[in-house]
Amino acid sequence: MAHSHSGSVNYFESANKVIYEGKESTNPLAFKYYNSQEVIGGKTMKEHLRFSIAYWHTFTADGTDIFGAATMQRPWDHYKGMDLARARVDAAFELFEKLDAPFFAFHDRDIAPEGSTLKETNQNLDLIVDMIKDYMRTSGVKLLWNTANMFTNPRFVHGAATSCNADVFAYAAAQVKKGLETAKELGAENYVFWGGREGYETLLNTDLKFELDNMARFMHMAVDYAKEIGYTGQFLIEPKPKEPTTHQYDTDAATTIAFLKQYGLDNHFKLNLEANHATLAGHTFEHELRMARVHGLLGSVDANQGDPLLGWDTDEFPTDLYSATLAMYEILKNGGLGSGGLNFDAKVRRSSFEPDDLLYAHVAGMDTFARGLKAARKLIEDRVFEDVIQHRYRSFTEGIGLEIAEGRADFKTLEQYALNNQPIKNESGRQERLKAILNQYILQV
């Protein structure tokens, strides 16, 4: 049997608890910028950032890729089956404690293996959920969100809620039903829907409208069941444009918002936005965050980064200060993420295979967003962008512009104005100047 919650397990024995040592520190296992109790704008860094560790990349990923076998050296991997599942829970809560991480997130199949039947699978899940619940009680770590893996098993080859097979739709419903019960039991602050295989490869064999209708039916059923059992966490939907299907239905923030509004789901769902998925969609991360924010639908963040030179989801740990600063700017302008957080949906590189690399990676990501938070806060305090934007759009605060903004103008009055107007004069957007100022703020904090 694997160890249970006994306190005797020590999978990361070479590392002490990671503490804040300041930017002069040369200790790779110390925070240089993330000082959890430092107060910024009335909230601690811990409250602003709400860091979460992703169970799948951190404790189940083994480094396998399409060109090669597993590389990861994990001291718990000699266990099998349910013993392995238990050992991973021990390892997880040890790492949470060493990083002082307040939250974690998981797919159902990350934490417990599938059995030969759905009933057996659910029994496996119940055993591990009980163990996690014990650890949560004693550690104070909370569940940011859980979700259902409806993409790995071959039954989902044609999708889950968008499958052409009604038996698969029914199985997926049973799986999410269990997921919502798990969310309630563990006090998950959110529940995520990522349409792993909800999309298509070719329109030649696809009834696109029927699949979208079915996906909406599925989500309405989930909303109804959450109400029935009294689960009050925030529902989140996560956009991604492609991979594993050619065309994912929840392509990006704008597409997903249109879907939610079309099917009357926008009062029940917000968006869980991932940086790498924005890259795949041809957007900056801050574009996706802004799009969700202006629609009042920014819910949570999967903090990672992609490689713009590659056309697939690389899920690297976030170390780009520029992107992190602009992301935190959007989050602060949103008044925070509410029940959401910054979940490190990120994996160490295949060649970073030692257990300590998990610590180095999370320290890097946490420091990056701490620095981004401080720079973004200063930018907002100094109204760097706000004053520029206010000045740039000032023509809409008086005269004909004010008439337009207040809805008092029409095509006829605007034509009359245009006919009598002197030559139009535009002003420079001063983009380069703004980028230089942004760099200055990032470098100074």
Swiss-Prot record:
Its main location: cytoplasm. Its EC number is 5.3.1.5. GO terms for molecular function: magnesium ion binding; xylose isomerase activity. It is found in: Cytoplasm. GO terms for cellular component: cytoplasm. Its cofactor is Mg(2+). Disulfide bonds: none annotated. InterPro entries: Xyl_isomerase-like_sf, Xyl_isomerase-like_TIM-brl, Xylose_isom_bac, Xylose_isomerase. The active site is at H107, D110. It comes from the Bacteria. Binds 2 magnesium ions per subunit. It catalyses: alpha-D-xylose = alpha-D-xylulofuranose. One of its GO terms (biological process) is D-xylose metabolic process. It holds the Pfam family AP_endonuc_2. Gene3D superfamilies: Divalent-metal-dependent TIM barrel enzymes. Mg(2+) 1 binds at E238, E274, D302, D345. Keywords: Carbohydrate metabolism, Cytoplasm, Isomerase, Magnesium, Metal-binding, Xylose metabolism. It is an enzyme of class 5 (isomerase). Mg(2+) 2 binds at E274, H277, D313, D315. PANTHER family: PTHR48408, XYLOSE ISOMERASE. Belongs to the xylose isomerase family. HAMAP family: Xylose_isom_A. Homotetramer. This is Xylose isomerase.
